[in-house]
Amino acid sequence: MFMGEYQHNLDAKGRLIIPAKLREQIGPAMVLTRGMEGCIFGYPLTEWAKIEAKLAKLPLTKKNARSFTRMFYSGAMEGEFDKQGRINLSPTLKKHAGLVKECVIVGVSNRIEIWAKERWEEYSDEANESYDEIAEDLDDIEL
């Protein structure tokens, strides 16, 4: 399970260090794709296979299903870690997430998310304000 928040910078070649604690769980490679709210989702290959199986069941007759799968898969890339624990991010994903230099890597259960630091701070501040209300709306999961 992924958790925690880590700050790292993109290097001049567009590579990002993924913390060792997360890499240990991910393995030698991962799949990165467009995430929600302007971040990048990163999945271990085993989790990606589960998502692929679910997406394959979406009906091609539904416009939203076609649109979502196009964007989700067209932005996807498999990335391997180099010896320093860095992963090379595609220009498409960097643009989607607004990544320039400072990044925040967030562990979120079965995936990691990569955010531009500024965007993460805005999102986090807003989400913190409504955290209690969100928890009440999700009371059926009984935390």
Swiss-Prot record:
Gene3D superfamilies the record matches: Transcriptional regulator MraZ domain
Family: Belongs to the MraZ family.
Oligomeric and partner information: Forms oligomers.
CDD domains, per the entry: MraZ_C, MraZ_N
Gene Ontology process terms (BP): negative regulation of DNA-templated transcription initiation
UniProt xrefs under NCBIfam families: division/cell wall cluster transcriptional repressor MraZ
GO cellular component, one term: nucleoid
Record organism: Lactobacillus delbrueckii subsp. bulgaricus (strain ATCC 11842 / DSM 20081 / BCRC 10696 / JCM 1002 / NBRC 13953 / NCIMB 11778 / NCTC 12712 / WDCM 00102 / Lb 14)
Subcellular location, record wording: Cytoplasm, Nucleoid
Chief place of localization: cytoplasm
Domain SpoVT-AbrB intervals: 5-47, 76-119
This protein's name: Transcriptional regulator MraZ
Pfam families associated with the record: MraZ
Domain of life: Bacteria
Molecular functions per Gene Ontology: DNA-binding transcription factor activity; transcription cis-regulatory region binding
Nucleus among keywords: no
